[in-house]
Amino acid sequence: MNVFPVTDGSNHLLGVIDLSKIRKVLFRQELYDQFTAAQLMEEPPARLSIEDPVTVVMETMERTHADTLPVVNNRGEYVGFITRTKLYAMYRQVMVDYSEE
C-alpha cells in the first residue's frame, strides 16, 4: 500500500498522500524541507464509513477506480484503510467457507 493518511491532532482525516504521485520528491533529499504534508496531500476519491456495508464499499471502489480507500468513524476520525486486494481476499474466503458447509 502506497497511500498514507494525513490527520489533525484529533485524528480527523484531512487527506491522503499517495507515494506513487510524489516520487520526484521522495528521491531528492534536498527537496524535503521545501514541502509540507499539506502541500503533498490530496483529497481521497471517497471516504468510507465503518458502518458502510460491503456492497457500498465495492460500489465505491468500482465508481472511483480506487484500490485503497480510507475508513472513518462517525466523528470523521481516521480508522484505517481498506484495499481492493483485502476485500477480494475476504470475499474468496467467505465463498470457500460457504462451499464447505
State each model region's role:
Residues 1-3, 66-68:
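Short loop/turn microsegments at loop-to-beta-strand junctions
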Residues 5-7, 16:
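Short, conserved beta-strand edge motifs with alternating hydrophobic and charged residues
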Residues 7-8, 72-73:
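Core beta-strand residues in small-molecule sensory/regulatory alpha/beta domains
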Residues 13-67, 74-101:
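Tandem CBS (Bateman) regulatory domains
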